[in-house]
Amino acid sequence: MALNWSFRVIFVSAMWCALLKFATLEEREDDNDYGGGCPFVVLGNGTHAKPAGCSHLCNGAPETLDNIECYNVTEEVAKRMTPDIPYTCWLGWCSKGECKRDNRTEVCYRGSERE
């Protein structure tokens, strides 16, 4: 009789431990937070994508890019572009959050939302 009772205690203890183990394996919601930033609007040219401008507001705070090629187009204008229609865009270089335009242009387009 004592052996039967011991088996039950061990079995219940093992089940309780397993339940606690699986209960702690749940993924927390904040595990996939990669910094909380906001993505920049980008335009493509068939082979590369570049940001439209070099600064924007993210949750009320400014975010800027530096030392990267950009299109000298505001995010507002880029968002109004018709997807998959080619446009002529001025190229520039991000410097302290401003896309400094140079004397080059290239075809650019806004991708479709499904991409």
Curated annotation (Swiss-Prot):
Judging by the UniProt lineage, the source's domain of life is: Eukaryota
Residues the record marks as carrying a glycan: N45, N72, N103
**What broad class describes the main subcellular location of this protein?**
secreted
| GO MF annotations, alphabetized | C-C chemokine binding
Q: List the disulfide bonds.
A: C38-C58, C54-C94, C70-C99, C89-C108
The UniProt keyword set, sorted, is: Disulfide bond, Glycoprotein, Secreted, Signal
Q: Does the keyword Disulfide bond apply?
A: yes
Q: Which InterPro entries match?
A: EVA_Class_A (IPR045797)
Q: Which residues form the signal peptide?
A: 1-25
Which GO CC annotations does the UniProt entry carry?
extracellular region
Q: Where in the cell is it found?
A: Secreted
Q: What does this protein do?
A: Salivary chemokine-binding protein which binds to host chemokines CCL3 and CCL4.
What name has this protein been given in UniProt? Evasin P1181
